[in-house]
């Protein structure tokens, strides 16, 4: 059996560009792509923390070290500059890989879209 699992997440990225007339996609700083284990043309889901919008597109490379998160084409209508988004990708993982210790790559970034930390799990949520 295979399970559809969270593979990669870039948490609380600030949108730096919205390019309505650019070919559709989301340009992501290459440093962030690599840290999250994402590759060019990979399908990504984007969840806008500010307005609740959720949509899918694909990743393209943004200038390395720039902090770029550019929503292009119709995706540019889903956010405003400065909105915080979560960028995620999923993968089909078989039971053997899961039992062997497969983990997602979670990347946490600061206000300038620079990496401030990594994790390989989402902590258990509690009421405290």
Curated annotation (Swiss-Prot):
Residues holding substrate: 57, 73-75
Pathway linked to the protein: Cofactor biosynthesis; (R)-pantothenate biosynthesis; beta-alanine from L-aspartate: step 1/1
A single GO molecular function term of this UniProt record: aspartate 1-decarboxylase activity
Primary site of residence: cytoplasm
PANTHER family per UniProt: ASPARTATE 1-DECARBOXYLASE
Name the UniProt record assigns to this protein: Aspartate 1-decarboxylase
Record: active site: 25, 58
Cofactor(s) needed for function: pyruvate
Details of cofactor binding: Binds 1 pyruvoyl group covalently per subunit.
Function according to Swiss-Prot or TrEMBL: Catalyzes the pyruvoyl-dependent decarboxylation of aspartate to produce beta-alanine.
Oligomeric form and interacting partners: Heterooctamer of four alpha and four beta subunits.
Location relative to the cell: Cytoplasm
Keyword Cell wall biogenesis/degradation assigned: no
Similarity section: Belongs to the PanD family.
Modified-residue entries (Pyruvic acid (Ser)), positions: 25
Lineage of source species: Bacteria, Pseudomonadati, Pseudomonadota, Betaproteobacteria, Burkholderiales
GO biological process: alanine biosynthetic process; pantothenate biosynthetic process
E.C. designation(s): 4.1.1.11
Recorded superkingdom: Bacteria
Assigned keywords, A-Z: Autocatalytic cleavage, Cytoplasm, Decarboxylase, Lyase, Pantothenate biosynthesis, Pyruvate, Schiff base, Zymogen
GO cellular component assignments: cytosol
Lyase recorded as keyword: yes
Reactions listed under catalytic activity: L-aspartate + H(+) = beta-alanine + CO2
InterPro entries: Asp_de-COase-like_dom_sf, Asp_decarbox
Post-translational modification: Is synthesized initially as an inactive proenzyme, which is activated by self-cleavage at a specific serine bond to produce a beta-subunit with a hydroxyl group at its C-terminus and an alpha-subunit with a pyruvoyl group at its N-terminus.
């Amino acid at each position: 059996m295979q399970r559809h699992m969270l593979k990669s997440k870039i948490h609380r990225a600030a949108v730096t560009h919205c390019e309505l007339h650019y070919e559709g996609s989301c340009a992501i700083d290459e440093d962030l792509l690599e840290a999250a284990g994402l590759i060019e043309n990979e399908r990504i889901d984007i969840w806008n923390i500010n307005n609740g919008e959720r949509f899918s597109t694909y990743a393209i490379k943004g200038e390395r070290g720039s902090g770029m998160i550019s929503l292009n084409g119709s995706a540019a209508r889903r956010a405003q500059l400065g909105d915080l988004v979560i960028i995620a990708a999923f993968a089909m993982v078989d039971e053997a890989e899961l039992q062997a210790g497969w983990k997602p790559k979670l990347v946490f970034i600061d206000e300038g879209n620079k990496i401030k930390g990594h994790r390989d799990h989402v902590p258990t949520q509690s009421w405290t």
